[in-house]
Amino acid sequence: MSPQTETKAFVGFKAGVKDYKLNYYTPQYQPLDTDILAAFRVTPQPGVPSEEAGAAVAAESSTGTWTTVWTDGLTSLDRYKGRCYHIDPVPGEDNQYICYVAYPLDLFEEGSVTNMFTSIVGNVFGFKALRALRLEDLRIPVAYIKTFQGPPHGIQVERDKLNKYGRAILGCTIKPKLGLSAKNYGRAVYECLRGGLDFTKDDENVNSQPFMRWRDRFLFCAEALYKAQAETGEIKGHYLNATAGTCEEMIKRAVFARELGAPIVMHDYLTGGFTANTSLAHYCRDNGLLLHIHRAMHAVIDRQKNHGMHFRVLAKALRLSGGDHIHAGTVVGKLEGERDITLGFVDLLRDDYIEIDDDRGIYFTQPWVSTPGVLPVASGGIHVWHMPALTEIFGDDSVLQFGGGTLGHPWGNAPGAVANRVALEACVQARNEGRDLAREGATIIREAAKWSPELAAACEVWKEIKFEFPAVDTLDKKKG
């Protein structure tokens, strides 16, 4: 051993592997207002104590690695390390815990969801000492929130742009999602909009395929919405999907939509990525475009209860990155979504301040200060019989989208749109009169169908259609 090496070996550095809990489990720590707080569902491998598992998560998602390194002495780990500061056993599970971790704000680049997630949900999710790991919730401090632009416009600005108040926004996804020519696609858009819908929508996987290139689709959809506006006297829109293979191409498509005078564009924020989404959100605010967000790929990340990331975290991340609408499940349709959990993250999207609420799976109080709200979108397997429940669950500040529930009408697209508009307005009127939508919903729809043949036909077609399967992602059992 050289004298130089020998000196380093004996000056405050002891090589080797230490238990994570010696440095990263700190139950005495009081989180700071500026810390990012995370609640992880941790399932350790057999024989791994909960304290070691929680500390490993804190270490591997912040400053730690598997062995002691001499460069630890060149910085202040106490300033920068993540800390597991509290652990709760999960009721009803033998070896599963909710581990709470605090991260100093200096670990994260300002205004970057990409950087935040690279640390918090990075390599630690493949850590061998853990059988499974799920990020249940985040507390984003106000100091970090203020480094983000957030949604391009928000709920109130959108209502003012559209001149639509006192009810949910009504939409429709054009079907079939793939295979239509641009002209036939535009025809379907026109029929739905003139029938009474506020918006129509590109499906998430409609980008620029050989059967329908994006520029052709944009042109025919613009023609359709202008024609429908002229006939109805209402402001209309179509979510033009700007998602593309590169950020440059995505912005080019958004620019063309703006040049056509379209009011709104769309992005698939998970497959497109947070960097691309934030860039598009900034462009939309600067150029007066609304931004609709689809969550394609979310169930790969959030559906399994023990591993991945809960959608409430993805919803918070979207509010930071930017979007005016985001799909949020339906509770009553064909897609996963338990009522209490769904209402929890719907409030996280819309409200300025949300309290801890175990009954809805909200682990942290979350203030949003001046960040605009995001409209939740209910879409997927819904039809006119669901309208009372959707109105009661989501309220006015939402977007209700009926794809098959519009284009599947036996008389065509426009009558399908009429049926949905009549059903929505009947439910809003009944609610405003003090009627109980949960109890009287079917009666309200039948009464409205007496003076709307379009609604009566829709009621007959979908009277037996239900999607009743138990939810995969459920709230934990209560203690005791």
Swiss-Prot record:
Residue positions of the active site: K175, H294
Site label Transition state stabilizer, positions: K334
Pfam families in alphabetical order: RuBisCO_large, RuBisCO_large_N
InterPro entries: RuBisCO (IPR033966), RuBisCo_large_chain_AS (IPR020878), RuBisCO_lsu_C (IPR000685), RuBisCO_lsu_C_sf (IPR036376), RuBisCO_lsu_fd_N (IPR017443), RuBisCO_lsu_N_sf (IPR036422), RuBisCO_lsuI (IPR020888)
Tagged with keyword Transcription regulation: no
Subcellular location(s) per record: Plastid, Chloroplast
Cofactor details (free text): Binds 1 Mg(2+) ion per subunit.
Keywords: Acetylation, Calvin cycle, Carbon dioxide fixation, Chloroplast, Disulfide bond, Lyase, Magnesium, Metal-binding, Methylation, Monooxygenase, Oxidoreductase, Photorespiration, Photosynthesis, Plastid
Cofactor (UniProt): Mg(2+)
Processing after translation: The disulfide bond which can form in the large chain dimeric partners within the hexadecamer appears to be associated with oxidative stress and protein turnover.
Record GO cellular component, one term: chloroplast
Positions bound to Mg(2+): K201, D203, E204
N-acetylproline: modified positions: P3
Alphabetical list of Gene3D superfamilies matching this protein: Ribulose bisphosphate carboxylase, large subunit, C-terminal domain, RuBisCO large subunit, N-terminal domain
Annotated EC: 4.1.1.39
Subunit note: Heterohexadecamer of 8 large chains and 8 small chains; disulfide-linked. The disulfide link is formed within the large subunit homodimers.
Family affiliation: Belongs to the RuBisCO large chain family. Type I subfamily.
HAMAP family: RuBisCO_L_type1
Function: RuBisCO catalyzes two reactions: the carboxylation of D-ribulose 1,5-bisphosphate, the primary event in carbon dioxide fixation, as well as the oxidative fragmentation of the pentose substrate in the photorespiration process. Both reactions occur simultaneously and in competition at the same active site.
Extra remark beyond the main annotation: The basic functional RuBisCO is composed of a large chain homodimer in a 'head-to-tail' conformation. In form I RuBisCO this homodimer is arranged in a barrel-like tetramer with the small subunits forming a tetrameric 'cap' on each end of the 'barrel'.
Name of protein: Ribulose bisphosphate carboxylase large chain
Species in which this protein is naturally found: Basella alba (Malabar spinach)
Lineage summary: Eukaryota, Viridiplantae, Streptophyta, Embryophyta, Tracheophyta
Gene name linked to the record: rbcL
